[in-house]
C-alpha cells in the first residue's frame, strides 16, 4: 500500500530585511505556493530495519529535513517509529534543490503533515509549525498549506493572505547560490532595514500589484548581494525576456500572471 501527497514549491514575491535578532536576519516576505511545481512524498509499505528514505537528494540522509523531522516526531509518539518499520519514504524530486524554492522545507512539512495523519498524532497546525521551525525557517509556511501568506520573524510567523490564484512560472539557471555567502554580502555591503510602514504597505498589497509596480532589486533585498557574487544572475544574461523576480537567495527567477 502506498499513500502520497504533493509537496509544492514556493516563491518570495518580495523579501525585505527588517532587522537582526540573535544573529539571525528578521524578514518580511510574501510566500506564494507554486501549484505547477511539486515533488511527491510517498509512504510505501514493506519491512525495514531502520528508517528508510529514498530520493535524488544532494545530501546524506542524516542531513535531510525529512530525517530530522522523523527524529523529532518519534520522540512524541512510539507509533511513529513503529510505522516506519513497516513503511519507507520515497520522494520523487522535481523541485530544484538549493534554488530559493523551498524544496527541502516543503518536503519536511509534507512529511510532518502525513505522519500526523497516519499515526493519529492529532497535533494542531500551530504545534506542527513549532516542530517544523526547529528544522528549517521556511517549514512553517508549508505546514499551514496557504496559497499565499505574509511571513515574518525568521520565518516562524505565518499569516494567510487572501488573493486570487496566481499563475507562476519559474526558471532555475545552473548557478549555485550559497545562502550564507549572500547574507554575508548583504550585511557587509548592502545592509538596509525596511521600515515598519513599508512592511505594512507590502503586507496589504496583492502579489500581482507588487510584481507589476516593483522591480527585481526593490522587491528582494538579497538580489543585489547575490548578483555581486555572480554576475550571471542577470535576467538579460539568462535571456529572460519577460519581467522576472528573484526568489529567496536564489538562484531561481519567476514571473507572475493572474490565473
Question: Can you say where each PLM-predicted feature lies in the sequence?
Answer:
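ATP-binding N-lobe of GHMP and related small-molecule kinases
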Residues: 1-99, 117-127, 148, 162-164, ...
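A general structural signal for well-ordered alpha-helical segments in protein cores
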Residues: 10, 24-27, 66-70, 108, ...
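Short beta-strand scaffold segments in enzyme catalytic cores
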Residues: 15, 39-43, 138-143, 149-150, ...
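Conserved, helical-rich catalytic subdomain that frames metal- and/or nucleotide-binding sites
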Residues: 51, 142-244, 256-259
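A short, flexible low-complexity segment enriched in Lys/Arg and Gly/Pro that occurs
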Residues: 67-86, 113-114, 216-235
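Glycine/serine-rich anion-binding loops at beta->alpha junctions
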Residues: 90-117, 137, 243-253
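Contiguous, small/hydrophobic- and glycine-enriched helical/loop subdomains that border
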Residues: 108, 112-153
Amino acid at each position: 500500500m502506498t499513500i502520497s501527497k504533493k509537496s509544492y514549491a514556493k516563491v518570495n514575491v518580495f523579501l525585505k530585511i527588517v532587522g537582526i535578532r540573535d544573529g539571525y536576519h528578521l524578514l518580511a516576505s510574501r510566500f506564494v505556493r507554486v501549484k505547477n511545481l511539486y515533488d511527491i512524498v510517498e509512504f510505501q509499505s514493506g519491512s525495514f530495519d531502520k528508517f528508510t528514505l529514498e530520493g535524488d537528494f544532494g545530501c546524506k540522509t542524516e542531513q535531510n529535513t525529512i530525517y530530522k523531522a522523523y527524529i523529532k516526531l518519534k520522540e512524541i509518539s512510539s507509533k511513529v517509529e513503529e510505522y516506519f518499520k513497516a513503511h519507507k519514504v520515497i520522494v520523487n524530486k522535481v523541485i530544484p534543490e538549493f534554488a530559493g524554492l523551498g524544496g527541502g522545507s516543503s518536503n519536511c512539512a509534507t512529511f510532518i503533515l502525513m505522519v500526523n495523519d497516519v499515526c493519529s498524532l492529532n497535533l494542531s497546525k500551530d504545534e506542527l509549525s513549532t516542530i517544523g521551525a526547529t528544522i528549517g525557517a521556511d517549514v512553517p509556511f508549508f505546514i499551514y498549506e496557504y496559497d499565499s501568506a505574509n511571513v515574518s520573524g525568521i520565518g516562524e510567523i505565518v499569516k494567510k493572505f487572501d488573493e486570487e490564484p496566481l499563475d507562476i512560472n519559474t526558471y532555475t539557471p545552473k548557478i549555485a547560490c550559497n545562502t550564507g555567502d549572500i547574507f554575508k554580502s548583504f550585511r557587509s555591503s548592502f545592509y538596509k532595514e525596511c521600515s515598519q510602514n513599508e512592511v505594512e504597505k507590502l503586507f496589504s498589497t496583492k502579489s500581482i500589484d507588487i510584481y507589476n509596480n516593483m522591480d527585481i532589486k526593490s522587491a528582494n533585498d538579497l538580489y543585489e548581494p547575490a548578483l555581486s557574487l555572480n554576475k550571471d544572475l542577470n535576467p538579460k544574461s539568462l535571456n529572460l525576456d519577460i519581467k522576472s523576480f528573484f526568489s529567496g537567495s536564489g538562484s531561481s527567477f519567476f514571473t507572475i500572471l493572474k490565473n
